[in-house]
Amino acid sequence: MKILCIFLTFVFTVSCGPSVPQKKTREVAERKRECQLVRGACKPECNSWEYVYYYCNVNPCCAVWEYQKPIINKITSKLHQK
């Protein structure tokens, strides 16, 4: 009877989780979605103006470096008027 109880417990715990192919498919879809969030694309090779954000399944997620304007602090002098 104990063996039957242990066997049933094992069967129920194993059957409750997602199967390996379903889990892998879900992970790949999440990676592709994250790649799109950073405005990237999953493709075989990145161009020179792109960097590898991470890998979507087998191909890299290529994201474009964002151009940021340099911050220029203007130096202004105040003339004292008397």
UniProtKB/Swiss-Prot annotation:
Residues 1-16 form the signal peptide. Disulfide bonds join 35-61, 42-56, 46-62. It comes from the Eukaryota. One of its GO terms (cellular component) is extracellular region. It is found in: Secreted. Keywords: Antibiotic, Antimicrobial, Defensin, Disulfide bond, Secreted, Signal. One of its GO terms (biological process) is defense response to bacterium. Belongs to the beta-defensin family. Has antibacterial activity. This is Beta-defensin 113. It comes from Homo sapiens.
